Regions:
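N-terminal intrinsically disordered, cationic/polar leader segments
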Residues: 2-145, 149-178
Length: 178
């Protein structure tokens, strides 16, 4: 049995959850998110909790059960607290400017690299750090991954864009002649 799917989701004050035929709407102080209903699952709102159940005990149903519960939980957290990921830029001559929806970076290429975030995601810059924030966990993670992919950290000196809490595996340089 799915251990995650069996746990009820507590609804905080100020959050309303509406269960529809094909989607679940979660509205809160930071905004509104729509979660699609997964097959073979049913969602009920009872008192101050959301309970997700499944129709049978097939392996696929168990997987959908846990996924549905996790998606609803992420939506509830998103509309109350929000999500954020922090990235840092390391490298000589690497610069960062802008904020809001668009940032411009000098990453050692012959041209400045511009990145425009999708709607619902905010970018803030602080010296050599980028903070990606928003209410949709999937969008925030996707934007952070796209920014990181512009200049992945290299293993010798660690130059590039990396997550703040990421641990890089470094390599030793060439030994050379003696």
């Amino acid at each position: 049995m799915s251990r995650i799917g069996k746990q009820p989701i507590d609804i905080p004050a100020g959050v309303t959850i509406t269960v529809g035929e094909s989607e679940i709407t979660v509205a809160g102080p930071k905004g509104q998110l729509i979660v699609p209903v997964q097959p073979q699952t049913t969602t009920k709102v009872e008192e101050n909790q959301v309970i997700v159940t499944r129709s049978d005990d097939e392996p696929k149903s168990r997987a959908w059960h846990g996924l549905q519960r996790a998606l609803i939980n992420n939506a509830v957290i998103g509309v109350t607290k929000g999500f954020e990921k922090k990235l840092e830029i390391n490298g000589v001559g690497f610069r960062l400017s802008g904020g809001g929806q668009e940032i411009e970076m000098a990453l050692g290429f012959s041209h400045p690299v511009k990145y425009r975030a999708p709607e619902g995601v905010q970018l803030t810059t602080n010296k050599m750090e980028i903070t990606v924030s928003g209410i949709d966990k999937q969008k925030v993670g996707q934007v952070a991954a796209e920014i990181r992919s512009l200049k992945k950290p290299e293993p010798y000196k660690g130059k590039g864009i990396k997550y703040v809490d990421e641990v890089l595996i470094r390599k030793a340089g060439k030994a050379g002649k003696k």
